[in-house]
A protein has these predicted regions:
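Conserved acidic segment of CheY-like receiver
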Residues: 3-13
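Two-component/phosphorelay signaling modules centered on CheY-like receiver
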Residues: 13-31
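Conserved phosphotransfer microenvironments
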Residues: 53-68
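His-Asp phosphorelay/catalytic-motif detector in bacterial-type signaling
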Residues: 73-78
Length: 123
């Protein structure tokens, strides 16, 4: 049986590795990406079921989300962006760039299955 692929973009060990482990526990294959310049191309090449994007990484993360949205081959993929609880500006910028869901790290940790269900039922 082929397990669905999730791409997780992160630089920070926590919560990135924790998210990877939780997704693997839910039977996802996980591809970790740590360079925002490669995120759109990797997404197009690997065709994941969904993406998680850590907004606290260095580089143009919202630009990477915009590239994913602008490409017909990837524009339909759910993007869940997350940031520390106090980084509301980063969450708003990610939503404007096209992230389907924007959540705080505490919400991500506590409600992963619910977020997956919501992301995979978006139009």
């Amino acid at each position: 049986m082929l397990h669905p692929l999730a791409i997780v973009f992160y630089e920070r060990l926590m919560p990135g590795s924790q998210l990877v482990n939780r997704l693997q526990d839910l039977n996802y294959r996980v591809l970790a990406v740590n360079n925002p310049a490669l995120l759109a191309a990797t997404t197009k090449r690997e065709t994941p079921l969904l993406l998680f994007v850590d907004l606290e990484a260095r580089g143009d993360i919202t630009g990477a989300i915009e590239k994913i949205r602008a490409d017909a081959a990837t524009s339909h993929l759910p993007v869940i962006a997350f940031a520390p609880d106090h980084k509301t500006e980063a969450l708003a910028a990610a939503q404007k760039a096209g992230a389907n869901l924007t959540v705080s790290e505490s919400a991500l940790a506590g409600h992963l299955q619910t977020l997956l269900d919501q992301a995979l039922h978006l139009d």
